[in-house]
Amino acid sequence: MTDERDDTPATVTQNPWQALRRLTPARIALGRAGVSLPTRPQLAFQAAHAQARDAVHLPFDPAALQAQLHAQGHATLLLHSAARDRDQYLQRPDLGRQLDAPSAQLLGDHAAAHPGGVDIALVVADGLSALAVHRHAAPLIAGVAEGVRAQGWSMAPIALVEQGRVAVADEVGERLGARMVVILIGERPGLSSPDSLGLYFTYAPRVGLTDAARNCISNVRPEGLGYAAAAHKLLYLMREAWRRQGSGVLLKEAAEVPLLEAGRRNFLLD
């Protein structure tokens, strides 16, 4: 029997940058099958898109997060925005920036029972990815709270807001009489990151502020900005805002972070 060499061209043409794929979750060097994507990356894209859609509609579980925070020794307040459900939240962004009447009353009662205000108010909202909050809020808060205690700042009970958007933190902070407010919120899911957590920090919060008054730290998750690094950056912003009495465009995030030492040469230079 004579061996015959198969000269049929490979179905998938590999990309010369394929070695770079192990360094990033980004969709690079996927190769091609003719003029189209190969089947495997096409299916992976569809799966990632489905994960992103699921993250947007995943119901927030404030009771589970509340239990985690209670285990850390934190008091909590369960609140709700003026958006009655997920559909209205997505269609009416303005309602996600406001508290409903019972939540506003609850904060008013708490503030009346604790006159004088507080230094820090922490707010957690589901945003566009409850998955991010479920996975990352509690471990991040543990690091932030430790830094807040080290500064000697007072902290209000952590407010858990269902169907909340970023600006709802301004109302929470104002009603609690907080000098500074931080909201941890699920970011809009991406095709490689359905669980990214965002932090928004504001000094002297009040209803009606714009994004110019806020500082943002984004993509908080183990595959992005780790918990320790995010807490470090946030505490830097808090200290500087306290000193300068301002945030947003008045405050530049310039926290020093430790540099990683390379364990080997950059393969691009070899």
UniProtKB/Swiss-Prot annotation:
Molecular functions per Gene Ontology: cobalamin binding; ethanolamine ammonia-lyase activity
Cofactor binding notes: Binds between the large and small subunits.
BP terms from Gene Ontology: amino acid metabolic process; ethanolamine catabolic process
Domain of life: Bacteria
Enzyme Commission code: 4.3.1.7
Pathway in which the depicted protein is active: Amine and polyamine degradation; ethanolamine degradation
GO cellular component terms attached to this protein's record: ethanolamine ammonia-lyase complex; ethanolamine degradation polyhedral organelle
Reaction(s) catalysed (UniProt annotation): ethanolamine = acetaldehyde + NH4(+)
Entry keyword set: Bacterial microcompartment, Cobalamin, Cobalt, Lyase
Function: Catalyzes the deamination of various vicinal amino-alcohols to oxo compounds. Allows this organism to utilize ethanolamine as the sole source of nitrogen and carbon in the presence of external vitamin B12.
Annotated family: Belongs to the EutC family.
Subunit structure: The basic unit is a heterodimer which dimerizes to form tetramers. The heterotetramers trimerize; 6 large subunits form a core ring with 6 small subunits projecting outwards.
Name of the protein this chain belongs to: Ethanolamine ammonia-lyase small subunit
Gene name for this UniProt entry: eutC
